[in-house]
Amino acid sequence: MKKMMRPLLYTLSSFLLVLIILFSVYAQRDIPVEKLKLKYAQSPSKFLPLMGMQVHYRDEGNPNDPSPLILLHGTSSSLNTWDSVVKIIVSNPKNKKRIIRFDLPAFGLTGPNPENDYASPYYTNFVDSFLNMLQIKKCTISGNSLGGGIAWQYALAHPEKVNKIILLDATGYPQKNEKGSLGFKIASLPIINNLLLFITPKSLIKKSLETVFYDKSFVTEATVTRYHELLLSAGNRRATLSLFKSRRPLNPKEIKSIQQPTLIIWGEQDQLISVDNAYLFKQDIKNSQLFILPNVGHIPMEESYVKVANAIQNFINQ
């Protein structure tokens, strides 16, 4: 019996030793959100108390615009992903748009929600509650990746509030053969993914971003640091993991019910959500336009911000 137990004990001891080494080398504590606010909540950032959270948002441009542009970011991202696009649109004297963007629950400086609910209906309700607080009655809603999925679901739930939709590499259809980022792959693995609560080295974020961006020159030290630090914001890692654990497939049949004019923007080299999905959206949404960006990855608003900003402006002004 003792001889039979020895290999098992040896394996367990080796596993524990590896864990100890990993924790001693790579384990990182959460960063207090108040500390991160000093760096990432500069003007025009504001905070809105909503649903037990302090929602980080920015409201820029023409305050009299009757139909603001709402921008939603993707998983493990933040409102900062739209910085360059917003700057171009707001600075255009011909475009008198109001642009509102915010950190979704689980991400950025908004952080986790008290209910620990990250299902699709929760996000739809959150967006509606946020827009109601700002007294937004009509809007154009735009989103990337997770944010894109939230955008079209919100448009279906509240068609009277949405004039137009803009989808950038959006979720919606079952994923097939995509490579996915290293971070997302680990987050999807049962049991092992719990290590991400403590071990999220900057090198992992860099490796993931190198999958997200087609042009690796965009994976700068500043960009890696931003994604890494905001992931480490207190509670965000646990919230992100909860999101992955609770994630359920969307119903692509619902997409055919979208009536609003829709602009579909896609990076042709997207390794997370294949460009094939862009053509599915185009096929299923009757009143839609498709804009494919060659040599661009999963987040075109960062990698090809000039073309994205111009496409958005042209679409809104139609």
What are the residue ranges of the model-derived segments?
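Active-site loop/oxyanion-hole signature of alpha/beta-hydrolase fold enzymes
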Residues: 51, 58-60, 101-142, 310
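Acidic catalytic loop of the alpha/beta-hydrolase fold
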Residues: 269-273
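Conserved HGGG/HGGXW glycine-rich cap/lid loop of the alpha/beta-hydrolase fold
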Residues: 62-109
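Conserved alpha/beta-hydrolase catalytic His-Asp/Glu region
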Residues: 35-38, 178-180, 198-257
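Flexible "cap/lid" loop of the alpha/beta hydrolase fold
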Residues: 156, 165-194
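Short beta-strand/loop motif that positions the catalytic acidic residue
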Residues: 258, 264-266
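Catalytic active-site module of serine/aspartate enzymes centered on a nucleophile-bearing elbow/loop
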Residues: 288-289, 293-318
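Alpha/beta-hydrolase fold catalytic core
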Residues: 1-67, 94-97, 137, 317-318
